[in-house]
């Protein structure tokens, strides 16, 4: 599955196409990045929409254990997970500690999925892990499950398809 930058320039901040359609209640939806980061972040859906975005191809969502078809998911638009992490900056004490970092994505319901530094920054997984705020060209609200974490490089997307992403905790694992 290919992710392509939405705007021609990655530094473009002209996203009026998206912000004009947002719900004022989206300001209440907050995603936090915390833990071993230089700059802890608290982001609203509106803040996510203002960042450079990527889109992914539609996919079939299937149950991981039974392979039962759940539904076809239209293309997501959102921010690369790596871009959010890079924006917060990684904090570590010793050289090489970053290679032992994990990123725990946690939903409002407590469902949590991990990523390693190697997955996100040293493999194709990082090129296809997004925090989505739009699906099928329509903005997602909290009622729709926004923000949604999606890992497009996974063989089966369901286990790391997380609705109502609340926080991303960054940790350095002990040797």
Where are these regions (language model features)?
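N-terminal intrinsically disordered, low-complexity segments enriched in P/E/S/T
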Residues: 1-175
């Amino acid at each position: 599955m290919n992710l392509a930058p939405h705007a021609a320039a990655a530094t473009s901040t002209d996203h009026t196409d998206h912000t004009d359609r947002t719900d004022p209640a989206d300001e209440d939806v907050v995603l936090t990045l915390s833990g071993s980061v230089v700059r802890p972040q608290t982001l609203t859906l509106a803040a996510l929409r203002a960042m450079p975005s990527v889109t992914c191809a539609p996919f079939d969502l299937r149950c991981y254990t039974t392979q039962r078809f759940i539904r076809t998911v239209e293309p997501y638009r959102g921010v690369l997970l790596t871009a959010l992490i890079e924006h917060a900056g990684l904090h570590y004490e010793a050289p090489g500690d970053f290679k032992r970092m994990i990123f725990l994505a946690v939903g409002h319901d407590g469902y949590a999925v991990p990523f390693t530094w190697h997955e996100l920054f040293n493999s194709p997984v990082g090129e296809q892990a997004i925090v989505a705020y739009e699906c099928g060209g329509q903005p997602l609200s909290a009622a729709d499950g926004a923000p949604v974490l999606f890992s497009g490089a996974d063989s089966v997307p369901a286990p790391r398809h997380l609705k109502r992403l609340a926080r991303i905790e960054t940790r350095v694992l002990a040797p």
